[in-house]
Design a protein with these regions (language model features):
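Long, contiguous binding/interaction regions
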Residues: 2-46, 50-89, 97-197
């Protein structure tokens, strides 16, 4: 198993036929696992904190849907391995979820550059989010992407604080058109602790 290496390899996946038979239960278990890793922020933004487990599930599901075998697997590993937390960071998929396409387009047109305004506070010490490299975030026209991949890189002191009892962790966005913050619950923090070495 490659969890300790923080890298998904072919050996971490179950065979396609077994996945297909077990898929319903696997997905049900994943929903439960992800429950405390989902954090809503304001009316439209939701952070889904990724992990080795969520990325294995994503690769497995893509292979199940597209049935591309080993050739596809190479591409999926290139795409999803950078989103496996490396032991000193938290990684999240941030989604702006607005059902109406016209409203969504108008909102995203107002929040260009929002990926530069995301932060986490660990005991009032701010950690700026780093957008995933080589992924489109804000277009040349200033329109934000509805899906953002972000990293929060923490130093050893911040990680130790994260692990301490009664720690105050805050997640926020400070954009002039979308400014919201929320405190992480004890259940959120406990789930995210597994991402650190």
């Amino acid at each position: 198993m490659s969890k300790e290496k923080r890298l998904i390899e072919k050996e971490d996946l179950i065979p396609a036929n077994i996945y297909s038979e077990s898929r319903k239960q696997i997905r049900k278990d994943l929903v439960e696992f992800k429950k405390n890793r989902r954090i809503a922020l304001g009316p439209y933004a939701t952070f889904y904190f990724e992990s080795f487990e969520t990325m294995v599930a994503q690769v497995q599901e893509m292979l199940h849907i597209e049935k591309g075998g080993d050739e596809q697997l190479k591409d999926e590993l290139i795409a999803y391995n950078p989103l496996v937390p490396n032991g000193k960071e938290l990684v999240a998929t941030l989604m702006f979820e607005i059902d109406n396409p016209i409203s969504r387009g108008a909102f995203l047109g107002k929040v260009g550059g929002i990926e530069e305004k995301i932060f986490m506070k660990v005991d009032n010490e701010e950690v700026k989010a780093l957008p995933e490299a080589d992924v489109d975030r804000t277009s040349e026209e200033g329109k934000a992407s509805s899906v953002q991949f972000i990293h929060f890189k923490l130093n050893d002191d911040q990680i130790n604080k994260f692990k301490s009892d009664n720690i105050n962790i805050e997640l926020g966005i400070d954009h002039k058109e979308y400014s919201h913050a929320t405190k992480l619950t004890e259940a959120n923090i406990k789930s995210l602790l597994a991402d650190f070495i």
